[in-house]
């Protein structure tokens, strides 16, 4: 069935069966959530002052069957997440493909935009120019986090 308790899920998100998150730390402590963006140091954690915090999943993100989100995970917009059998990283930047346990560029941002257009058209809607502009702006302001995560992924041996 899956469980996404105490989570915030964006629009047009497609969750594979049994996508699950933890919303409680094993030590019952309050949850820190990674945040990124202009004016913030990379890897900044925001203390939630709460013991029940699920995941933050951006618009147009897709997960495979059996994806496991960590407590307080932050996943950007237009991501593709492939399950590894292990909990996901706590941060996956906008536009990233998480495959084999590492963040990659995948087939690129244009393919993600095409996929978002296909998802909306399947439901008789269209991805407007304004929607595309917002997604492009999000991508632009988070580009440094994306490139850092991809670079780190290239140095990490892939999990089988």
Predicted segments, located by residue:
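Glycine-rich hexapeptide-repeat left-handed beta-helix
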Residues: 1-153
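Intrinsically disordered, low-complexity serine/proline/glycine/threonine-rich regulatory regions
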Residues: 152-160
């Amino acid at each position: 069935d899956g469980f996404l308790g105490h989570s915030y899920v964006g629009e047009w998100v497609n969750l594979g069966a049994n996508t699950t998150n933890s919303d409680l730390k094993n030590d019952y402590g309050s949850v820190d959530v990674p945040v990124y963006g202009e004016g913030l140091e990379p890897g900044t954690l925001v203390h939630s002052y709460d013991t029940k915090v699920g995941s933050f999943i951006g618009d147009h993100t897709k997960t495979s069957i059996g994806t496991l989100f960590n407590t307080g995970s932050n996943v950007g917009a237009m991501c593709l997440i492939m399950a590894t059998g292990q909990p996901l990283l706590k941060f996956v930047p906008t536009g990233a493909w998480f495959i084999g346990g590492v963040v990659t560029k995948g087939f690129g941002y244009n393919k993600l935009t095409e996929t978002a257009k296909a998802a909306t058209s399947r439901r008789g809607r269209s991805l407007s120019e304004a929607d595309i502009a917002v997604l492009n702006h999000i991508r632009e302001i988070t580009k440094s986090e994306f490139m850092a995560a991809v670079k780190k992924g290239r140095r990490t041996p892939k999990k089988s």
